[in-house]
Amino acid sequence: MNDTLKVLETRRSCRNFKPDMIPEETLEQIVRAGTYAPTGMGKQSPIILAVTNKELRDQFSEENRKIMGAPVGMDPFYGAPVILVVLANKAVPTHVYDGSLVMGNLMNAAESLGVASIWIHRAKEEFESDFGKKILADLGIQGEYEGIGHCRSEERRVGKEC
């Protein structure tokens, strides 16, 4: 079986991450793969935010927890040190599909590099909130962007654990 098919058949979601940061070069390779996802009409509208700052990561976690309605102290990101947020421009008719393909590329690229991941939802609601709008404004991102999801990653553990 070729390596691509093996990745597609073996990738699974991880719900127990180590706090160790993945190497920057590995993260860059994963993000780069996300930018090569196919998009409708070749618009390439999705944006990938790599959240590596622990304070900001924890703010995302708290916002996501509130939207989820989970108890205080629960981490919807399962302790992952990196969050990759995918946003897609609402002005593009295929924005949800485009962002979803980016998420798939991110998770499959992570798997191919031995990095665990999981798709976490509620990004749409996060970026419709004041919290999300402020993040976009602070980053200078203009336009109507919808959060598609979060890909959380870390180096995969040996054996059945991720």
Q: What do these predicted regions represent?
A:
Residues 1-160:
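Acidic, surface-exposed loops and disordered segments
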